[in-house]
Amino acid sequence: MPKYLISYRKTEGGGQKPEWTSFTAQSETSLEAHAIRERVDRRMSVLGEQLWGTGEVVWVGNGRLDDVLYRREEAAPETSIVYGLVEE
């Protein structure tokens, strides 16, 4: 079953510097941007976090975990959510 790394920029209050947080999700079907956004929204509502940026969801491709994390750091500053397929 494919495993996705999903990362999003969050803040826990006004004036804070945004930081990346990540989690993995497994799905038998391929996940598209709207499904990724729904998962992030659910997680943030439970944790009391706020999404930072424009709300844009960006696919960063597939690769080893460290490759996907590296590509996350290359995302444009206004990008809110990035996700990629992690090879096992």
Write out the residue ranges for each language-model feature:
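Short, mixed-charge low-complexity intrinsically disordered segments
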Residues: 41-88
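A short, exposed loop/beta-hairpin motif centered on an aromatic-Gly-Thr core
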Residues: 17-32
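Compositionally biased, low-complexity segments
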Residues: 3, 23, 75-76
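Residue-level signal for the start and early helices of compact helical domains
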Residues: 14, 35, 59-61
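Short aromatic-glycine-(Arg/Gly/Cys) micro-motifs in beta-strand/loop hairpins
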Residues: 1-20
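A periodicity- and composition-biased signal for non-globular, repetitive helical segments
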Residues: 9, 15, 32, 43-45
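Coiled-coil-like amphipathic alpha-helices with heptad-repeat character
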Residues: 4-5, 32-34, 67
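Short amphipathic alpha-helices in soluble, non-transmembrane regions
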Residues: 36-40
